[in-house]
Amino acid sequence: MQIGPYSIAPKVILAPMAGVTDKPFRLLCKRLGAGLAVSEMTISDPRFWGTRKSLHRMDHAGEPDPISVQIAGTEPQQLAEAARYNVDHGAQLIDINMGCPAKKVCNAWAGSALMRDEELVARILTAVVQAVNVPVTLKIRTGWDCDHRNGPTIARIAQDCGIAALAVHGRTRDQHYTGSAEYATIAQIKAALQIPVVANGDIDSPQKAAQVLRETGADAVMIGRAAQGRPWIFGEVAHFLATGEVLPPPSLAFVRDTLLGHLEALHAFYGQPQGVRIARKHLGWYAKDHPQSADFRAVVNRAETPDAQLALTRDYFDALIAGVPPALSDAA
């Protein structure tokens, strides 16, 4: 898949997720097979650009090309200025968020709430595309609710405004993440456009990725929640799409080493105590399908230092590898 001058391969992309797709996670997913990793949503209001959170979100030093930064907001010129600011700070792709269903975003008329105002969508897209000399992409949902499934209309507006690629989540804003994603609307959008279309929603296995590509004709798939605690899914999907072969599940030793490396990267990136706190949700995701995961989470979530968090994690997985019960009560 081509987005401007950038060839995106393999055709499996990490979705932007607030509080998840930070620099350590993006680097990990790219290393394990993602063809593109989109940053967390950054707010377009310049009053917040100097906050600790925003500075972390805007840190892309050392990331492989292309660097894709997602922006969110409601005011066309403010979004245009945010796009310029991020390009000046290293962004090579600008992604506009019109897909987030969160109430705190939609109540401010950002994210997927923008899909209710097609004229405003056109003004935002035009302003951002004209503001920067890098490709601009867009993420949307299939519509606002089941009675207003206007994704195809928004998609045509996007193409007409110069958007370089479009990602579509197969739910309406009203669904949030309930029910199941549907792909017929994505197929309809793909059939009507000349720009690349990326399918998103409920893609949680290599087989599902292949199925969605067949059903939609999309140029790539985008994976979000299924990568939480499972960043190797990108390599699994890429391998299956290339060969038709399902890779065996990763070994416990591989999971352990991947997680320990991820923890160390979080500790280094955020410092103490923030790194330990942010790592806790990732620990829960990595452990959730393993024996005594609830007990492990209860113990490791009480760790207050990087060394303690790493030691408890290493001991837990070492016990699983050895086939013995983890000594969680002793660790507590």
UniProtKB/Swiss-Prot annotation:
Catalysis performed (reactions): a 5,6-dihydrouridine in tRNA + NAD(+) = a uridine in tRNA + NADH + H(+); a 5,6-dihydrouridine in tRNA + NADP(+) = a uridine in tRNA + NADPH + H(+)
SUPFAM superfamilies: FMN-linked oxidoreductases
PROSITE patterns documented for this protein: UPF0034
Keywords: Flavoprotein, FMN, NADP, Oxidoreductase, RNA-binding, tRNA processing, tRNA-binding
Enzyme class: oxidoreductase
HAMAP family: DusB_subfam
Function, in words: Catalyzes the synthesis of 5,6-dihydrouridine (D), a modified base found in the D-loop of most tRNAs, via the reduction of the C5-C6 double bond in target uridines.
EC nos: 1.3.1.-
Pfam family, one: Dus
Residues that hold FMN according to the record: P16, M17, A18, Q70, K139, N200, G201, D202, G224, R225
Family: Belongs to the Dus family. DusB subfamily.
NCBIfam families linked: nifR3_yhdG
Protein's name in the database: tRNA-dihydrouridine synthase B
CDD domains the UniProt entry points to: DUS_like_FMN
Molecular-function annotations in GO: flavin adenine dinucleotide binding; FMN binding; tRNA binding; tRNA dihydrouridine synthase activity
Active site: C100
Cofactor dependency: FMN
